[in-house]
């Protein structure tokens, strides 16, 4: 369901950006969503992404085009428990958020935007929204992102009521075997073998956590944490580990793939529906701007190196 057509602007206005743009107030928003109904986070032609719903709700309230910047894009079918975005408002827009209520601007916006997003039957919901600390950038200030992935291994654990958030795997899995695989790829590496690379983008990442454990219900929960994840990286790592679990590949497969730095028929993606973006980590407020500057600088260097490699 679309709150407003993507290709029309009924307000006759555009996003801020001209030379006479007033001073802006940055807003920080934390939201969750059920990704099953959407074609991923990003806006795309002819399909509905979560970004479109959030921006259209904001545009309805603010009465102009709004662009949100996200901490990490999620693919089609992938969920988020605590996704983080930022967007900018003028002081007039910020102070006008309460309208006739006694609420402060942040809580007022929280109530109003959830009133609109509630039309999506709770598939998208804002947990927090308020004025951001100075220097905050949802994408570049982030220190790390953490994902989880649920697997019901063995048919005795299959539960139809949890199938939309759980991968069903017929055989029981040796998690000690898979944890040994996971340990072999921790650290800073070029994860090209596990990523769908984008032009001028680096595939070097620092994988801080990759662990298989059993929850109280007996199902497996996989936890992955990294400074950032490139496209398809989480699902490719889990897919590779499951090839070892099935016996189709020998132990040491993930480390071997990491060293090869190649994508081929062995680059198998795990299903998207059990994958959840759980949390985005940020430094203390007084370190936000420095972290954003450092991340941008690293990205610029990586892009320059990528271009040199094409010469």
Cite the ranges covered by each PLM segment.
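Structured-RNA-binding interfaces characteristic of tRNA pseudouridine synthases
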Residues: 2-311
């Amino acid at each position: 369901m679309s709150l407003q057509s993507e290709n029309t602007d009924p307000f006759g206005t555009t996003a801020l950006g001209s030379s006479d743009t007033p001073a802006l107030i940055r807003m920080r928003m934390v939201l969750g969503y059920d990704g099953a109904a959407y074609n991923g986070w990003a806006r795309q032609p002819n399909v509905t992404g979560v970004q479109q719903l959030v921006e259209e709700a904001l545009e309805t309230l603010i009465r102009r085009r709004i662009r949100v910047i996200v901490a990490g894009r999620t693919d089609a079918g992938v969920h988020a428990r605590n996704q983080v975005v930022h967007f900018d408002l003028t002081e007039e827009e910020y102070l006008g958020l309460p309208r006739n209520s006694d609420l402060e601007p942040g809580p007022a916006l929280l109530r109003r935007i959830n009133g609109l997003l509630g039309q999506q039957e709770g598939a998208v919901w804002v947990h927090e929204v308020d004025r951001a600390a100075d220097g905050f950038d949802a994408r570049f200030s982030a220190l790390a992102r953490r994902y989880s992935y649920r697997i019901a291994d063995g048919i005795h654990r299959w539960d139809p009521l949890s199938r939309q958030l759980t991968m069903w795997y017929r055989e029981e899995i040796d998690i000690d075997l898979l944890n040994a695989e996971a340990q072999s790829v921790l650290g800073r590496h070029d994860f090209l073998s596990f990523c769908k690379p984008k032009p001028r983008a680096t595939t070097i990442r620092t994988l801080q956590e990759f662990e298989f454990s059993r929850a109280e219900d007996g199902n497996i929960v996989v936890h992955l944490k990294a400074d950032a994840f490139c496209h398809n990286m989480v699902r490719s790592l889990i897919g590779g580990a499951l090839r070892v679990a099935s016996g189709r590949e020998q132990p040491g497969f993930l480390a071997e793939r990491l060293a090869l730095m190649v994508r081929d028929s062995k680059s198998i993606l795990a299903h998207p529906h059990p994958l959840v973006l759980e949390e985005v980590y940020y430094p203390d407020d007084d370190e936000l701007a420095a972290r954003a500057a450092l991340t941008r600088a690293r990205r610029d260097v990586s892009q320059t190196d990528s271009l040199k490699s094409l010469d």
